[in-house]
Amino acid sequence: MVRYDPQGVKIVLTAPRGEMSRYNGDPFGAFIAVFPEKVIPRVILRPEWFKPEDNPDGSARFVPYGLRKVEALLRRHFAEEDVVVCHPDNLERFVGPKTKVVGITSMDPMGLAYVSVTYSSIIAVPGDSVDGLEFRRVVENPALRKYDPLVILGGAGAWQVRHAGKVEAYGIDVLVHGEGELTVLDVFKKAVAGEPLPKEVHGSKVPIEFISPIVNAASYGVVEITRGCGRGCQFCSPTNRRRHSLPLPHILKEVETNIRAGSDSIFFATEDLFLYECGPKFEPNGPAMARLIEAVGSVPGVKFIHLSHIAIAPVAYDPKAVEMISPLLMEKTRYTPSFRSNYTEPFVTALFGIESGSIRIMKKYMRGKIWPFPIEQYHEVNVQGTGILNDNGWKPMATMITGWPDETPDDTVKSLELIDKLKGHDVFLVPLLFIPLEDAKLKNERRVSIEQLTPEQWDFFAEAWRFNIDVWAQELQPLFTFASLFSYFTYFRWKHGRKAFRPIMKIANFPVIGGMPEKFPPGAPASVNPRYCAEDEAMVARTVETMSIPVEMEGPQERPIEVLQRR
């Protein structure tokens, strides 16, 4: 137990309550905090989720992984008693006259991330998201106003505060963007010494030897296994980061740190599990992934292993790699009938990005998305890959985006066609609006507003949620029908007009009323399940084994490269 100065700790690190919570051990429960605070019932947003989990000395037991990375950097230079990471409810305990700087991290402080913008626009209820409200509570904390320490804001959402014009209003002195290993320590040293500071600091690509393991536990037992991506998607920021696989001893050290603090789960932070020790041309390394999962799973105290993201192309390219790791992951899955009564069987889950069904959009903005397959095979690879995951006990989630720059109605219809092809598969679709993120290549593009959505784009949202209800919650259809009809006639009719009528009728399960004449007719037969279609399987197999085409990549591999040929 550390003895902290009652007159204030020199450096205090914290985050909003919604980002500190572990949501009963379910990482995907955190999505609740992106919705408008006014529409989240208190029975769902349980008060106990936001209560502090403290160590005996008052420091936080579990905090976001990025904050632990900053703590590890600061511990290189500052004494242990000079740095504390605390729950925001405890700021008045640690911020005092001797406090020099308060560091805050936030993923979505102004509600400008993909999910929050999309669904706050559709729900159309004014006010902050839960994350936004909790962030404001941090920066308006009485202790910060009373003692006026320097405030440094980092995290993936730091850009949002500048974008919203709230930097001065929220009393923020420095914004830190990007990877911090080469910049953060210097900023805090200058802040403590009272030296002049820049208003904004941008991190640079970090060599692997500069990545320090965390020294205290992260929420959900997060450990970083890879960093960066390299596929070159222009709407995404991680693709601009140098791709690394962290060494197994480094990973195991972080696992042990989490378990020692009382976590019973480990969460693999990665842009794609299949990047772990992959080949130079993205070849998945099944044996290396199996060794990783076995090593982590064998650490005493590890009951569960969670995954963040995967890519679908490696699944279709090397199904045997999926077969190799799936039994190991199934042994450590939290998603079982004992965790949720509506789960009929255990399953593994992770998030991958479909993004669009339009080959034109994919070629323009995400040409390397399914490399080594040619982008023309995009539908087949996504459907086949999803089927392979299902066959190995996975029930993944997949994001799909509409509102791309220069998206046409035909592009949107192509996404609708891909949704139709996925029928018969277990996947949870997350339909979103395009958002120009600050550190992505498309940052200067304009995002579409809810008022500008075309009928096809409204139908895109309706089809995705109709798909989800059919796959995941058929028994709740009467509830969805009542809620859809009630919300339309009492609210959405006045908020969005008649353009919301057909989509809501589709969710209400009135397909004849909810269909889209001409473009996407109601009652069209579901596509043949390509998982069992020999022609589609042969198409993918031929691509893997024989095709060799140039693909222009963005990011670290900017030269043209060729599709892999299986020998």
Task: Please report, for each region that a protein language model flagged, where it lies by residue.
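Conserved SAM/AdoMet-binding glycine-rich loop
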Residues: 13, 257-396, 402-404
